[in-house]
Amino acid sequence: MRVLALLLAVKAACVLLVSSLTGTGAVNNSGRWWGIVNVASSGNLLTNSKNVQLVLDPSLALLSRRQRKLIRQNPGILHAIAAGLHTAIKECKWQFRNRRWNCPTTHSPNVFGKIVNRGCRETAFVFAITSAGVTHAVARSCSEGAIESCTCDYRRRGPGGPDWHWGGCSDNVEFGRMFGREFVDSSERGRDLRYLTNLHNNEAGRMTVASEMQQECKCHGMSGSCTVRTCWMRLPSFRLVGDYLKDRFDGASRVVYANKGSNRASHRADPRHLEPENPAHKLPSSRDLVYFEKSPNFCSYNGKTGTHGTSGRTCNSSSPALDGCELLCCGRGYKTRMEQVTERCHCTFHWCCHVSCLNCTSTQTVHQCL
C-alpha cells in the first residue's frame, strides 16, 4: 500500500508539473525565478527515459511561461540555473560579509527578501550577481556536455598567432549570455524606471562574465618543448566576477528615467533611457551598476523594508573599516566573550596518499554587536 501511495503521489506531482509548464498561472514578479534554488534539489529531480529532467514540484509555477518553455527546450539546463544561483548567493554573502547588509537569504520563493522590491545599490548587486551566475554556469555546462542544446564554443578555429592556434573546447559564453538574457530578463514587466534598472543590472552581470574571459593554452612539442600551442577561451573564476561587481557596487550610478520609451521588444535596457541624477556625472556604461533610490538603514530590524539589523553580528574591535565594531554596530556598542575553537593543525602528508592532522583547541575573543 505504501508503494502504491508513493507511485500515486509521484504521478500526481508529474501532472502538477505538466500543468504548471503549460498553464497560464505564471508569476511574473521580478526575481521570483530565484525560487528555483530551493526547488531544484536532488530530492526533487527525476529523469525520464529520454534523460530529460523533471522537477516534481509545482513551485515551478514561480517561473514565467517563457522561462518554463526555455527549460523544456534545453534539457539539462535546470541544474545549471540552480548551480549558478547557488554560486551567486554564496559569492554575494562573501562579498558583503563585513557590511551592515550582508546579503541575507531565506527559503521563500523571493530568496533575497524585500530588498529586491527597492531600487537601491544592494538591489542592483543582487540582480547583477544572479544574472552573472546563470550565464557563468550555463556557459560551463555547455562545454561539459551537460546541456543537450549546446556544446563547446568552436567559433575560434585555425591560426591565432605565429606559434599558436585556436583549438580545444572554449567555454560557450555566447550561449550563456543569450540564454541568460532570454531566461532572466523575461521575468521583468513594465516600462518604468525599475524595469530599466533591473534589465541594465542583469546585462551588467552578463557583460562582466563575457568581458573577463581568459585565454588558456597547452604546449605541444618534443620532450616538453613548446613548439606550438593550442589555445582556447576559459571562463573567469566567479570570485573575479564578484570582485568586479563589488567594485561597481561601490561606484554605482544613481539614475533617473529619461522618459524616451523602452526597447521592450529586445528585452534589453537601452542606456539612452537612463540618465544620471546629477547632470554633471557621466552616463553609466553597460558594465556599471545603476540604482534610483537611497539604501535603507541596515542598522536595526525593520520588517517593512526587510532589513535584519546588525545586532548579534561579529565585529572586529581593532578595525577602523566597515567590519569594525564602531561602524558595524552603528554606535550601539558591543559585548565581548571568550570562545573555545577546535581546528585541525600539525597536518602531515603520508605517502601514499593521505593526510593526518591533530585537533588543536584555542581560546579566541569574540565581539558581537549589541
Curated annotation (Swiss-Prot):
Localisation: Secreted, Extracellular space, Extracellular matrix; Secreted
Leader peptide range in chain numbering: 1-19
Encoding gene per record: wnt1
One Pfam family per UniProt: wnt
Keywords: Developmental protein, Differentiation, Disulfide bond, Extracellular matrix, Glycoprotein, Lipoprotein, Neurogenesis, Secreted, Signal, Wnt signaling pathway
UniProt xrefs under InterPro entries: Wnt (IPR005817), Wnt1 (IPR009139), Wnt_C (IPR043158), Wnt_CS (IPR018161)
Main location: secreted
Disruption of the gene: reported phenotype: Morpholino knockdown results in broadening of hindbrain boundary marker expression.
One GO term describing the cellular component: extracellular space
Entry annotated with the keyword Signal: yes
Disulfide bond residue pairs: C92-C103, C142-C150, C152-C169, C217-C231, C219-C226, C299-C330, C315-C325, C329-C369, C345-C360, C347-C357, C352-C353
Function, as annotated: Ligand for members of the frizzled family of seven transmembrane receptors. Acts in the canonical Wnt signaling pathway by promoting beta-catenin-dependent transcriptional activation. Involved in neurogenesis. Performs a partially redundant function with wnt10b in the formation of the midbrain-hindbrain boundary (MHB) organizer.
Cross-referenced PANTHER family: PROTO-ONCOGENE WNT-1, WNT RELATED
CDD domains referenced in this protein's UniProt entry, alphabetically: Wnt_Wnt1
Record protein name field: Protein Wnt-1
Sequence similarity: Belongs to the Wnt family.
Known glycosylation sites: N28, N316, N359
Positions of O-palmitoleoyl serine lipidation: S223
Organism: Danio rerio
